[in-house]
């Protein structure tokens, strides 16, 4: 029973994603790892490695999986940096993104 009489289905319509910011240092300059997107939206554009989190997946596990699948990198220490949650930031609907670095 729902004592608040709220339709909770409205609250379960968002997706979650993880972006992995990976920095490198070469020839005195800091570099950021980018990938070329292979799917829409934004196919063939440069992006920070990121993807959706599976419904049954913990966030740190998702970050490791996404970085491995998109770049081949493994065993990279990462920490949560920031969460982006503006409702209009993604063309396909509300996506809450957790950034790792």
Where are these regions (language model features)?
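Short Pro/Gly-enriched beta-strand edge/turn motifs at strand-loop
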Residues: 1-5, 80-83
